């Protein structure tokens, strides 16, 4: 078969017309150095701050230093096989994590990947880990309570929905225990919980997850893990990832509670990254923007108004406010709250719960020091009954501390002073509480009523715990309806006062403890 020149030229023209080049523009660069999880890349002209850079082997790095002739990026994951000369690409994307209800009851890593062996995570889309906090106009004042289930916290240092309340103290003072109990207490409150574990041992995190499961609270909780064995980059990003997951509920008119355990370890991870990127060190070798590291995270915890929720959901949710409440944890060294990171976070948050090792070792648990613990906005969120009955508790404890310091030097004390000391000791004893045993508003109110109205005067100090346990069992058995009513309304009036008085009078007359 012979082709003439006309046919050949026609065929070539046809092929040229059909030919289509699919070109994909990539901003590509070359790794010029790798050390300690930090890569320097040359040739990335259009990279953004915080952009994900695609590495060989389906891994990513995050661009943190944009310099004149190179980009400093931190690798998320293993980096031992990365070498000079390898090609990397810009993705044009900021780091995002999966969000949605499907994450509840799951344990995930910083990137939202499941690590609990329960299969893939169902999600409702992705959300950027870095987000701008709601503005002043979009917020609403805090006026609804978050009950932790701890008498000492709910009475003296109340927490409201949308508040940031710092939990601060030395190691082994019960900070995580307080946070975990607060999560357990939200089982039936409708508040979704996120627990972010940063730089902790995997065995400790596994224990927390097991306890949440035992007490039926895991189904309502997302656990985000960046354990001590993870890279500094993942430890630094974990709180932001957890916050993005919490904002999903906040922006849809629901309430969420997030625990950052703890931000001291996140600051140390960020310091490590910054020093490896050769950023100039400041106080305690932290970089200059360590305040911004925590402020941009904690400002995202807020109560947003109904207009914000309606606009965000495009009219699907109307008349509902949303909130994200944060309980950041900070670990101090030898009780030094004036160190750099603790003072930063104290100034960012709306109050702090200070846990003291001396109190913890003396058997006063939770080891809350009511003298320097404060809640700046939670008072407006307290239920009416708690507000009414908790007023005298803080005063009684303050007077007791003052007199206790005094009485060490005085040999003979008058009756009024003795009475005040005895009352203070009994209130201190009454505020003790076992772990994993959060109390409802009604039972807390009854106990506070007993302390406030002098029902403990003739109870021996050693029997205060027994008195409380017997009282709890008695009201559960005989007055469950009243307890339910108080839990639902939180109201306090002459009728409820009379009923509480009647319960205690009958209990003291007929029961033993």
UniProtKB/Swiss-Prot annotation:
Matches recorded under InterPro entries: ATP_synth_asu-like_sf, ATP_synth_asu_C, ATP_synth_asu_C_sf, ATP_synth_F1_a_nt-bd_dom, ATP_synth_F1_asu, ATPase_a/bsu_AS, ATPase_F1/V1/A1_a/bsu_N, ATPase_F1/V1/A1_a/bsu_N_sf
CDD domains: ATP-synt_F1_alpha_C, ATP-synt_F1_alpha_N, F1-ATPase_alpha_CD
EC id: 7.1.2.2
Cellular component GO terms, alphabetical: plasma membrane; proton-transporting ATP synthase complex
Keyword Signal: no
MF terms in GO: ADP binding; ATP binding; proton-transporting ATP synthase activity, rotational mechanism
Residues annotated for ATP binding in this entry: 169-176
Superkingdom of the organism of origin: Bacteria
The protein's enzyme class: translocase
Annotated Pfam families: ATP-synt_ab, ATP-synt_ab_C, ATP-synt_ab_N
Primary residence: membrane
Assigned keywords, A-Z: ATP synthesis, ATP-binding, Cell inner membrane, Cell membrane, CF(1), Hydrogen ion transport, Ion transport, Membrane, Nucleotide-binding, Translocase, Transport
Catalytic activity, as annotated: ATP + H2O + 4 H(+)(in) = ADP + phosphate + 5 H(+)(out)
Membrane topology value: Peripheral membrane protein
UniProt entry tagged with the keyword Transport: yes
Subunit details: F-type ATPases have 2 components, CF(1) - the catalytic core - and CF(0) - the membrane proton channel. CF(1) has five subunits: alpha(3), beta(3), gamma(1), delta(1), epsilon(1). CF(0) has three main subunits: a(1), b(2) and c(9-12). The alpha and beta chains form an alternating ring which encloses part of the gamma chain. CF(1) is attached to CF(0) by a central stalk formed by the gamma and epsilon chains, while a peripheral stalk is formed by the delta and b chains.
Protein name: ATP synthase subunit alpha
Organism (species): Edwardsiella ictaluri (strain 93-146)
Name of the gene this protein is made from: atpA
